[in-house]
Amino acid sequence: MSLVQSAMFNHHMGPSHTRSRSFELFQEAKTLRVAACKRSYSDDLNISTKRARTAPPSPPYETATPTRASRLVISNLVKPTSNLRSRSLSPNKKFSSPLSPSSSPIATVTSPISSPQNIKIKLPSISDALNLPPITSKEPVKLKPIVPTVSLDYFDTYKPNDENWRYGLLDKIAKESKHFHLNQYNYLNDHAKPSFDSKLSSKIQQSSIANGKKINFPYESNYTYLNKTYLNDVKNYPEYLELAAESLLQLKERQLPPPPLQSHQKQHPPPPPHLPVQGLLPVPAPPVSHFSSSYTTPQAPTFYHPPSQQQQQTPPPQTLHHQQPQPPISTHKFIPISPPSAKKSRSDLLKSPPKHHHHHAPRVCISCGSDQSPCWRPSWSIKQGQLCNSCGLRYKKTKARCLNDKCKKIPAKGEWTLMQSKGKETFEDGIEGYSCIACGWRVEVLPKS
């Protein structure tokens, strides 16, 4: 504030005002202090004029006895050098004058000493630098291809050298060699084919298939063949039309049995038909007659028949014209066997429970009605029957069964859990219980043993 006040006083003081000696000395000390603390851009460039920090300080001007007048002249005319300013370059110790160059009394005095290093460099503004046109080259830059130098040492890995060496070698052989001829090696030429001295087979030279009968595969597709070429094949090969008929006749002949021989018939006469005895025997096959004999001779059966119920039937003779295709004649004795029973549905098996016989009664599951099981398991009652393997395992885990005679379902573990989650219901007879998931009837649950 003292510097600002002094500057303000200098402007407002008149010429008749007289200053005291102490005021002049005080003003001179402030001027030297401001000049020593002030930094400029030229001070940073003036590196060569700086003195080493280890050197002893010396006065910049050698004066014996500086007087007050000489101090004023030096301070007014000569700008102090950088040796008098602070050695510290810390930004905290910078001092900038708040006064403008026009109002400051120190800035009005220019130093007569000048050097080329004090010239300030003027840089362009940011806007001017951004508005400059981009630097573009008029001609495109042509870069040379990167070729490895190692491959140049080996002619077989470098194509230009390989071709030059190969053609040079061929020219040298053709010129210098007298007993070597390149015509013997026609494989070097792409258009030439090797010639063989060995004889070819006559079957290969003279093909039995005419060229007109072949289908030109690369130039003829299925579409063009169906439109044009197949008519020529039909004309050239009429046997193709007869092939289908011949194949049908052959198949028909294979299905028909061969005609029986007369000697074979005499040696093995056909068995006679028999009537069933007391409903236990099945109905026999119809009688077989032959044109060679007018009647059949009965053959003794392997089982006993009452003489009153055993009858013989003599069929009328048939001529050859009315003979129908006959099955092959069996050479073994006629033994009637009970035909296999047809597989019944589950409802039929449940309606008709199996009859207990004293010999080999077939087993049927009383729950699902199946007669096929690897093993049989006990049910809830020995009198009613047994369970198959799957039903027996389910009943062993759940101990639950449907009481409906038409259902008799044994729920699986997941089905039984679903029945229990629905809860018990009250039925018409007033008994509470779980309902069957299949038919809705009451399910009987036995305690697990």
From Swiss-Prot:
GO cellular-component term (any): nucleus
UniProt keywords, alphabetically: Chromatin regulator, DNA-binding, Metal-binding, Nucleus, Repressor, Transcription, Transcription regulation, Virulence, Zinc, Zinc-finger
Main location: nucleus
Localisation per UniProt entry: Nucleus
InterPro entries cross-referenced by the UniProt entry: Znf_GATA, Znf_NHR/GATA
Cited PROSITE patterns: GATA_ZN_FINGER_2
Record's note on what induces expression: Expression is controlled by the transcription factor ACE2.
Assembly behavior: Component of the RPD3C(L) complex.
Record's protein name: Transcriptional regulatory protein ASH1
